[in-house]
Amino acid sequence: MSEKTVRTLTGKVVSDKMDKSIVVLIERRVQHPLYGKSIRRSTKLHAHDENNVAKIGDVVTIKESRPISKTKAWTLVEVVEAAAE
């Protein structure tokens, strides 16, 4: 069987109040269809954090996984950069 490519994204943790869960803000740049100006668009994704290692402000990498709950279908891979305290 062929290896399936796994979607990974990098973003900033905006909430870690839930147990074993984090909310990650993913920002991307798109061009306006008519005027061509570069615009920031953002998406908030819920991710599974098994060991509660990520804190607010951390830059993290998440990967797509099977649905874990109603809103969670992403899993924490690593903390790329810890937040300055």
From Swiss-Prot:
PROSITE patterns: RIBOSOMAL_S17. GO terms for biological process: translation. Coiled coil: none annotated. It comes from the Bacteria. Keywords: Ribonucleoprotein, Ribosomal protein, RNA-binding, rRNA-binding. GO terms for molecular function: rRNA binding; structural constituent of ribosome. The keyword Electron transport does not apply. GO terms for cellular component: cytosolic small ribosomal subunit. One of the primary rRNA binding proteins, it binds specifically to the 5'-end of 16S ribosomal RNA. Part of the 30S ribosomal subunit. NCBIfam families: PRK05610.1 (NF004123), uS17_bact (TIGR03635). PANTHER family: 40S RIBOSOMAL PROTEIN S11 FAMILY MEMBER, SMALL RIBOSOMAL SUBUNIT PROTEIN US17M. Belongs to the universal ribosomal protein uS17 family. This is Small ribosomal subunit protein uS17. The gene is rpsQ.
